[in-house]
């Protein structure tokens, strides 16, 4: 069995056990202010949480059966075995910083509820996203 599926089966067993304990505990606890019986909100939450982690574990199990041995399942794997290509990074690009400024301007507009700041921030954000995506689509002499 693969490691990701095991990581999800553990919480499933824990939450299912806690749901059973919780249901039996709330059935037999009686204090002066409540009616004796199952406390439904916590019971349903624990059962649904166990079901959701079970679904995720089964999905990961079925998915990982179809793939080859992963580096995290191989005992002699190195960190570099998992590392893939990170992609191209442009260290001289101004557009990520400009985009952050546009997001900040837009956030100030939302916080202070100024419509003109929201509109200008959205226009700046669209402009900087476009320039970031198209910066290598123009020739070098146009930079």
UniProtKB/Swiss-Prot annotation:
Keyword Cell membrane: yes
Keywords for this protein: Cell membrane, Membrane, Translocase, Transmembrane, Transmembrane helix
Family annotation (InterPro entries): Cyt_c_oxidase_su4_actinobac
Residue ranges crossing the lipid bilayer per the database entry: 7-27, 40-60, 86-106, 107-127
The family this protein is said to belong to: Belongs to the cytochrome c oxidase bacterial subunit CtaF family.
Function, in words: Part of cytochrome c oxidase, its function is unknown.
Name of protein: Cytochrome c oxidase polypeptide 4
Native organism: Corynebacterium glutamicum (strain ATCC 13032 / DSM 20300 / JCM 1318 / BCRC 11384 / CCUG 27702 / LMG 3730 / NBRC 12168 / NCIMB 10025 / NRRL B-2784 / 534)
Gene name tied to this protein: ctaF
């Amino acid at each position: 069995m693969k490691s990701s599926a095991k990581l999800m089966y553990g919480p499933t067993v824990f939450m299912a056990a806690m749901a059973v304990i919780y249901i039996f505990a709330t059935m037999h606890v009686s204090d002066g202010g409540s009616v004796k019986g199952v406390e439904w909100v916590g019971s349903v939450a624990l059962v649904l949480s166990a079901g959701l982690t079970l679904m995720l574990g089964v999905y990961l199990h079925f998915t990982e059966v179809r793939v080859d041995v992963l580096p995290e399942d191989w005992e002699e794997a190195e960190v570099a075995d998992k590392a893939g290509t990170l992609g191209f990074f442009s260290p001289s690009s101004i557009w990520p910083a400009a985009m952050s400024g546009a997001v900040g301007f837009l956030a100030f507009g939302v916080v202070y509820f100024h419509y003109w700041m929201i509109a200008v921030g959205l226009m700046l954000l669209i402009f900087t996203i476009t320039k970031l995506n198209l910066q290598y689509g123009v020739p070098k002499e146009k930079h």
